[in-house]
């Protein structure tokens, strides 16, 4: 009876009840928009009160294929009824076929499967150091990796050691040695540091998403890759947020590639080590991956790196289907076309409102800059107003609002959302 009573109470909880539960029992390491979501389909969400919203965050670009995509959830359920986890102590019948599929899909020799994005980043950093010692001949304990200022690669101690964001870094020292930070989008600064013979790698986000959707100058990534090649340094691309069709290409480092899911070109911005995550599973389970060619990946030997859950059969079945959806539904092309529509509408808004000063982005990874100080709460207040009007987005770095809907959003839905954003901002009054 007691269990039945608890169940009955839970089904009648309201928004305020859920907020109170998280506040009382959860760590206070997040500051969410005050909406409690209960259901999703495609680009749409519904809260516990039944109110409808359009999703314009996509779980930080993890839900590129849309919420609860039927093909992906079918793959999840089908595999979950057979086998979910074996660890890597044994082979399973999903991993090998998935590895073949994903390496051919992105055009690399080998893949190392992990779970979360930051796990994949750490894996790439370890692999880079290993290569530096074994292949480049760097003296033990001296390997360096160059990062770009404004980066966001996750929350672990290793990667926050290269962060310049006080919120991510303060009070978490001592920090990991062997990192050098140079300004983003500054080829000359990179050129000055990369000549150091102890540098093993350069890790770059093709577009800095968390920093506010900063798009580098045309040719920047090609120059980075060229410098890496000239100095025998590995180019590491963190495409956890930008990859898998989000920016209008399969990868943001693809340049003009139109492979639509079967990369055969050794393009001029091709990463030596590619990091993927988030949308690799369509937002269903944590799946990430590190891809590289044999000369790099085979530096790792059994026992030197691993993950209990990495490469599990459930993740492999889901990820393979999620990538098939990207290819079959031509989500790269959709993101490219709809992104142009969105930015054009936001440019019109800039002409109408002094509150918005800039729109930037690629594909369906975009942001608007609010005309206020970075430490102001204006962008937050606008996002709350957007929520009240049926659209969910989140500010980043105070005065920037990131807009990244699922790539399955229709042109009709996108136009409705642009209307919501426009009307909300035109009617917004600073408190």
Regions found by a protein language model. Name each.
Residues 5-431:
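Conserved N-terminal phosphate-binding loop of PLP-dependent enzymes in the Aspartate aminotransferase
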């Amino acid at each position: 009876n007691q269990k039945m009573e608890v169940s009955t109470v839970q089904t009648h909880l309201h928004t305020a009840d859920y907020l109170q539960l998280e506040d009382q029992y959860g760590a206070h390491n997040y500051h969410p928009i005050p909406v409690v979501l209960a259901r999703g389909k495609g680009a749409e969400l519904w809260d516990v009160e039944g109110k409808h919203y359009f999703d314009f965050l996509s779980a930080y670009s993890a839900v590129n294929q849309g919420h609860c995509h039927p093909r992906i959830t079918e793959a999840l359920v089908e595999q979950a009824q057979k086998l979910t986890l074996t660890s890597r102590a044994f082979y399973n019948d999903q991993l090998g076929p998935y590895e073949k599929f994903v390496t051919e899909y992105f055009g690399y020799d080998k893949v190392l499967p992990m779970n979360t994005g930051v796990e994949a980043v750490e894996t790439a950093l370890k692999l880079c150091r290993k290569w530096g010692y074994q292949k480049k001949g760097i003296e033990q304990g001296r390997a360096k990796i160059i990062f770009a200022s404004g980066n966001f690669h996750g929350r672990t101690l290793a990667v926050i050691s290269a962060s310049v964001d006080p919120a991510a870094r303060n009070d978490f020292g001592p920090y990991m040695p062997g990192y050098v930070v140079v300004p983003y989008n500054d080829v000359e600064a990179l050129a000055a540091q990369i000549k150091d013979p102890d540098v093993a790698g350069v890790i770059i986000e093709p577009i800095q998403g968390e920093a506010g959707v900063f798009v580098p100058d045309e040719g920047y990534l090609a120059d980075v890759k060229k410098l890496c090649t000239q100095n025998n340094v590995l180019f590491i691309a963190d495409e956890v947020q930008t990859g898998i069709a989000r920016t209008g290409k399969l990868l943001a480092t693809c340049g003009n590639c139109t492979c639509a899911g079967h990369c055969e070109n050794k393009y001029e911005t091709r990463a030596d080590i590619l990091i993927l995550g988030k949308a690799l599973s369509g937002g269903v389970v944590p799946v990430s991956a590190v891809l590289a060619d044999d000369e790099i990946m085979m530096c790792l030997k059994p026992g030197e790196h691993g993950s209990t859950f990495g490469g599990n059969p459930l993740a492999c079945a889901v990820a393979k289907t999620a990538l098939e959806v990207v290819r079959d539904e031509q989500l790269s092309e959709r993101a490219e076309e709809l992104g142009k529509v969105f930015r054009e509408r936001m440019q019109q808004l800039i002409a109408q409102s002094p509150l918005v000063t800039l729109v930037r982005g690629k594909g369906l990874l975009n942001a608007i800059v609010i005309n206020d100080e970075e430490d102001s709460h204006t962008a937050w207040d606008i996002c709350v107003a957007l929520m009240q009007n049926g659209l969910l987005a989140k500010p980043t770095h105070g005065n920037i609002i990131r807009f990244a809907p699922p790539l399955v959003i229709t042109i009709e839905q996108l136009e409705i959302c642009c209307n919501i954003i426009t009307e909300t901002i035109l009617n917004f009054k600073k408190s």
